[in-house]
Amino acid sequence: MSDAQQITLLVDGEETKVTTGTTGAELFFERRDVVVARVNGELKDLDQELPEGAEVEGVTIESPDGLNVLRHSTAHVMAQAVQQLRPDAKLGIGPYITDGFYFDFDVAEPFTPEDLKTLEKMMQKIINQNQKFVRRVVSEDEAREAMKNEPYKLELLGKKNEAAEAGEGVNVEVGAGDITIYDNVERKEGTTVWCDLCRGPHLPNTKLISNAFALTRSSSAYWLGNQKNQQLQRIYGTAWPTKDALKAYQERIAEAERRDHRKLGSELDLFSFPDELGSGLPVFHPKGGIIRKEMEDYSRQRHVEAGYEFVYTPHITKGHLYEVSGHLDWYKEGMFPAMHVDAELNEDGTVRKPGQDYYLKPMNCPMHNLIFRSRGRSYRELPLRLFEFGSVYRYEKSGVVHGLTRVRGMTQDDAHIYCTREQMKEELTKTLTFVLDLLKDYGLNDFYLELSTKDPEKYVGEDAAWEEATRTLAEVAQESGLELVPDPGGAAFYGPKISVQAKDALGRTWQMSTIQLDFNLPERFELEFQAADGSRQRPVMIHRALFGSVERFMGVLTEHYAGAFPAWLAPVQVVGIPVAETFNEYMFDVVDQLKAAGIRAEVDTSSDRFPKKIRTASKDKIPFVLIAGGDDAEAGAVSFRFRDGSQDNGVPVAEAVKRITEAVRNRTS
């Protein structure tokens, strides 16, 4: 073989010579787990020829990118099945998403659960046919001819040059580079049985999907995510490399449903969402109020120890405040509409005194700036750390409101720190350490950090200030030793931020605390302090919310603990259950001793039989159940029954009180 017939590739880090025209499938022929190739950093179908000098890496089906391709290909199979079941269905967009995929369809009737079962069977037939996914590069005219009966695809072709901004999922179908169509080709006859406008890549064939997939639900969705557009029907699904992986995922989903804080909030009588109040406006019941109070009280204690000063600000303000801050320019869509008040009219209807617009506050920072500006400040006062459990109101679309984790009225544990530029990095480091330590005290221990940087279309201030702020935040994050993940364009309009991402007991990631560095609002509010040399200087401002919001954090903790809160947070920490009514008085005496020690304890004196009382305490997820019968009363003891069903019998009352109070004080149970 002559050199002219060969090309050199860098394959998985090693230089390799292959024949000109070699495809990824040929290169990785012996590696059956490879489903696509990464060529010079881009994912490519295995049947594409590899260019001279390319860096090539085999991507396995179990890798993150391989899973995405698997799920995207499964979405195509589902769409093929839908158009077999309903030939008049028009195709929308069908991308992969976290743990699965979806596809949108314009259909006359919504899909039913029975439809999804039928579609799964049809999909399995398609998969078993081992159809090939074949990429075809076409001109725009050819694409329009192929998609002439698909109006939504034709619309996408018109958005090719604006795919990144055109709407939800558009860049899955069209974008920079060639226009491509993927054909599903029947193997025996070699005929195309279905096709879709798509950028790919895809699996080599449907057989690789196997039977490890499921359609999970259907819902409505607006075309391109825009409420002004046609409402379509969306089918969600999931796909995994093996049946065992699918089963494990389904078990995680089932456990997540059991832990759903909305369900547990109702079952445990913690909170509710009355229709009379409106969407996203929860109320906390007495038991939920106890948990919330304990969360807030401990946070207050830790903030005092860390040198924060407490402030309070009103719920509404004149609109001018948010003109100064920039919120009305950059955040108005997230605010409730203005209330126009204080106008005075003459008898003839003419205006004697113009009114003013007032707004429910979406953020506390402008008001904290007014506190800083209320008098002269010296460098000796800095860093000044202001803290507030501040109620804020944000207009979330009704479709995204979700229990406690996405509300319209919330309480932020909001701090704003004012410091000199010289203090900036040390203060950021202290703040991050404080945040992580406090989250650990609430039972979250698995973290990584995300660095959100400037959105070039939506920011205020000088580029140099943004660059300095971003660089400093990155240094602090890297020095923490935690993984740092970039979030390009994710910052608020006034400054970059670090967000702490925490994993719960199910391994799900939640955004918790945010730490934001801001040179811009001090400029807009003309904040100043007198420096050591007598000059007037601008402070640096650090925004920090630890819980994010109290409501959201409580929702996360409810699911993290599956409602079985540690004893220090539990609404009822101890339930005493006498084995018979004869021992009620003895148990009341034990509970009185616990109450005197600050423990939330009660006696179950209901008419239920003893086994039912035990089941009730278990259902209510009580941390400590104390049982007393004749032997216990005679010995001055009680028996412990724990959440896992284990018992510790004959514990002296004084020892029982000590154990419980220590567990609560040390937050160990």
Curated annotation (Swiss-Prot):
PROSITE patterns: AA_TRNA_LIGASE_II, TGS. It comes from Pseudarthrobacter chlorophenolicus (strain ATCC 700700 / DSM 12829 / CIP 107037 / JCM 12360 / KCTC 9906 / NCIMB 13794 / A6). The keyword tRNA-binding applies. Belongs to the class-II aminoacyl-tRNA synthetase family. One of its GO terms (biological process) is threonyl-tRNA aminoacylation. Binds 1 zinc ion per subunit. This is Threonine--tRNA ligase. The gene is thrS. It is found in: Cytoplasm.
